[in-house]
Curated annotation (Swiss-Prot):
Post-translational modification: Phosphorylation on Ser-35 by PKC/PRKCD abrogates its ability to dephosphorylate and inactivate the SRC family kinases.
GO cellular component terms attached to this protein's record: cytoplasm; cytoplasmic side of plasma membrane; cytosol; nucleus; perinuclear region of cytoplasm
Protein's gene: PTPN22
Protein name: Tyrosine-protein phosphatase non-receptor type 22
Highest classification ranks of the organism: Eukaryota, Metazoa, Chordata, Craniata, Vertebrata
Organism encoding this protein: Homo sapiens
Family indicated by similarity: Belongs to the protein-tyrosine phosphatase family. Non-receptor class 4 subfamily.
Disulfide bond sites: C129-C227
């Protein structure tokens, strides 16, 4: 399987994963479980980091370096120096120590940090955090600012020689002096990466890694990468750069996967790529790189290579002239179009300087760039990962050399990433002894480490060389088409970065806005019931919404029961959300209008419930109707403040799952009796003035009669509610409690307490009424059985009028 098929296979798999978002969550959950298992089983011990003298050197107690891969310091500058620092080596494509992943230095480890940088000859430091984040110190400042006095860290002196600001990061040129030796170290400080989160765009990260590889093109010395803990953001940069190196050299294995890569990296330092969002960021970055490379391959196979004959000599002459320059790259312009134009002008200008030397160089490089026939002999084995293998404390780094050291690493012709995304790096200076440039134009003689093995190379060595020479004679120079494809790829706009955004992502974004709108409105309505579980707060999947919920939601938008301040601004968004998933029973305007008409009909009849819904009495007299009408006379006098308060309490008890129309009717029934009772209880004298009493009883005073009549009317109202709507009382807990409270307050003992607090005159007249009641009980026991004492325990309406009414 060639590189084109491998890339296409990965793109197809990634597209399916983006459609089913759960796969990302499942994969990251496996990574977390793996780390938990390693920690519980002590698969990779951290005994050195747990020593008492080293505990204070760890920023976080749960991010400790594994013993077998930790960075050991041997450069001793004082008696207090030790060999410990919270840092690990991370394997690269061509070496076991390609990266140093470390935490942000503490105030007590600044000297250790610079000892590590100096001992391992680090040229590049990548900082992926801020000095302060969320009000907390994330990293001590180990660098100097431009124009600032040099900083002293033990025997090390650090000063800033220059600073280059990009849109999202800063490149600082630091001069570090130790004893009498001075070195130049470059710090890439990424400033727009939030902690435990991801940047909003992939482009700045790819640009950062691009610039890093312009300054250091290979793994001859490790690149130091750190954030605050040295695991989350640090792991993202390591994983992207590792994959980019594979892609550039054309050695993506058939079974390549981001999951396997990060799982292997987590065996070298704990919690690399710390969150699921960071995991998806790595996936998206790799996906973008693969898409760009596939565009180059498609254009290359369309026959555009015939347009270039002398582009390789011209380009290589530029490399020949610039490769010995002591200065670092001057053009790493972000605008790809301008860079391509400058590159074209440079090639036209230098076309006259073509000589035999450059043609000879290009002829040699054709051996590397065009192994057309011999490329089929390269079969890549599985990633050499030992995921579940137990590691000893004496575990050693192992490297695997090529079968013949010094033999060029042959690369596929279509994977020249130097002309693809690193055109600004043409003047990078060589680092390794073999003169391997970052744009991969010369043979690679580096020994190979664990990630991959090339098989059948011994058997095909002689055949490959012959085929390459024969191919060189039969084919013209064709790297100019790479140049042209580079121009095409470098024009990738930000819209192309979102090319991989499937329907699911956009769909999810739309759903998220609607869900947010629904939650805000639901919170306003149900914010008064923290102790009652409500089905609307549960997560509702897009395709599993029931019709009960969809019936309740539109009714809440009407505003007839709840206060207007609690209503959402628009009710159409909720309907559009359900309609988009075909799960709403109300998916037509006629259904909505019919529902509103039903509500208006119920509300129109609600104010006349006293007349239309009498208690079911076997024999009813006209006087009993007159008593109920008197009870309803006081309801218009209820203050608005009390009404709104009662409404809120009723509205929070919407817990049952049936249709909402009976609930609207119940709410209005609850409001009117409870309001009228509360206001009439302390004002019985007003009640006497405004209503005509029934025929006087022979042995009762007017005051005692009105107390009994109040309770009678209260019981009448309670009976109306309880007999008409038993289901609502069973299913609404808070409504029952609201109803019981005023009911109990109007027993004889509690009514006397209220009257004692409000008016002493009424309180004084209450005790004489009790003998009158006992007398009345002898004459009219049937009336007392249905009134006052039994009304609130067994709410029943009056069956017969008092015998003294002379009807």
């Amino acid at each position: 399987m060639d590189q084109r098929e491998i890339l296409q296979k990965f793109l197809d798999e990634a597209q399916s994963k983006k459609i089913t978002k759960e796969e990302f969550a499942n994969e990251f959950l496996k990574l977390k479980r793996q780390s938990t298992k390693y920690k519980a089983d002590k698969t990779y011990p951290t005994t050195v980091a747990e020593k008492p003298k080293n505990i204070k050197k760890n920023r976080y107690k749960d991010i400790l370096p594994y013993d077998y891969s930790r960075v050991e310091l041997s450069l001793i500058t004082s008696d207090e120096d030790s060999s410990y620092i919270n840092a690990n080596f991370i394997k690269g494509v061509y070496g076991p120590k390609a990266y140093i992943a470390t935490q942000g230095p503490l105030s007590t480890t600044l000297l250790d940090f610079w000892r590590m940088i100096w001992e391992y000859s680090v040229l590049i430091i990548v900082m992926a955090c801020m000095e302060y984040e969320m009000g907390k110190k994330k990293c001590e400042r180990y660098w100097a600012e431009p124009g600032e006095m040099q900083l002293e860290f033990g025997p090390f002196s650090v000063s800033c020689e220059a600073e280059k600001r990009k849109s999202d990061y800063i490149i600082r040129t630091l001069k570090v002096k130790f004893n009498s030796e001075t070195r130049t170290i470059y710090q890439f400080h990424y400033k727009n990466w939030p902690d435990h989160d991801v940047p909003s765009s992939i482009d700045p990260i790819l640009e950062l890694i691009w610039d890093v590889r312009c300054y250091q093109e290979d793994d001859s010395v490790p690149i130091c990468i750190h954030c605050s803990a040295g695991c989350g953001r640090t792991g993202v940069i390591c994983a992207i750069d590792y994959t980019w190196m594979l892609l550039k050299d054309g050695i993506i294995p058939e079974n390549f996967s981001v999951f396997s890569l990060i799982r292997e990296m987590r065996t070298q330092r704990p919690s690399l790529v710390q969150t699921q969002e960071q995991y998806e960021l790595v996936y998206n970055a790799v996906l973008e790189l693969f898409k760009r490379q596939m565009d180059v391959i498609r254009d290359k196979h369309s026959g555009t290579e015939s347009q270039a004959k002398h582009c390789i000599p011209e380009k290589n002459h530029t490399l020949q002239a610039d490769s010995y320059s002591p200065n670092l790259p001057k053009s790493t312009t972000k605008a790809a179009k301008m860079m391509n134009q400058q590159r074209t002008k440079m090639e036209i200008k230098e076309s006259s300087s073509f000589d035999f030397r450059t043609s000879e160089i290009s002829a040699k490089e054709e051996l590397v760039l065009h192994p057309a026939k011999s490329s089929t002999s390269f079969d890549f084995l599985e990633l050499n990962y030992s995921f579940d293998k137990n590691a000893d404390t004496t575990m050693k780094w192992q490297t695997k050399a090529f079968p013949i050291v010094g033999e060029p690493l042959q690369k596929h012709q279509s994977l020249d990433l130097g002309s693809l995304l690193f055109e600004g790096c043409s003047n990078s200076k060589p680092v390794n002894a073999a003169g391997r440039y970052f744009n991969s134009k010369v043979p690679i003689t580096r020994t190979k480490s664990t990630p991959f093995e090339l098989i059948q190379q011994r058997e095909t060595k002689e055949v490959d060389s012959k085929e390459n020479f024969s191919y060189l004679e039969s084919q013209p120079h064709d790297s100019c088409f790479v140049e042209m494809q580079a121009q095409k790829v470098m024009h990738v706009s930000s819209a192309e970065l979102n090319y991989s955004l499937p329907y699911d992502s956009k769909h999810q974004i739309r759903n998220a806005s609607n869900v947010k709108h629904h939650d805000s409105s639901a919170l306003g309505v149900y914010s008064y019931i923290p102790l009652v579980e409500n089905p609307y707060f549960s997560s509702w999947p897009p395709s599993g919404t029931s019709s009960k919920m969809s019936l309740d939601l539109p009714e809440k938008q009407d505003g007839t029961v709840f206060p207007s301040s609690l209503l959402p601004t628009s009710s159409t968004s909720l309907f559009s959300y359900y309609n988009s998933h075909d799960s709403l029973s109300l998916n037509s305007p006629t259904n909505i209008s019919s529902l509103l008409n039903q509500e208006s009909a119920v509300l129109a009849t609600a104010p006349r419930i006293d007349d239309e819904i009498p208690p079911p009495l076997p024999v009813r007299t006209p006087e009993s109707f007159i008593v109920v009408e008197e009870a309803g006379e006081f309801s218009p006098n209820v203050p608005k403040s009390l009404s709104s308060a009662v409404k809120v309490k009723i509205g929070t008890s919407l817990e049952w799952g049936g249709t909402s129309e009976p609930k609207k009717f119940d709410d209005s029934v609850i409001l009117r009796p409870s309001k009228s009772v509360k206001l009439r209880s302390p004002k019985s004298e007003l009640h006497q003035d405004r209503s005509s009493p029934p025929p006087p009883l022979p042995e009762r005073t007017l005051e005692s009669f009105f107390l009994a009549d109040e309770d009678c009317m209260q019981a009448q109202s309670i009976e109306t509610y309880s007999t008409s709507y038993p289901d609502t009382m069973e299913n609404s807990t808070s409504s029952k409690q609201t109803l019981k409270t005023p009911g109990k307050s109007f027993t004889r003992s509690k009514s006397l307490k209220i009257l004692r607090n409000m008016k002493k005159s009424i309180c004084n007249s209450c005790p004489p009424n009790k003998p009158a009641e006992s007398v009345q009980s002898n004459n009219s026991s049937s009336f007392l059985n249905f009134g006052f004492a039994n009304r609130f325990s067994k709410p029943k309406g009056p069956r017969n009028p008092p015998p003294t009414w002379n009807i």
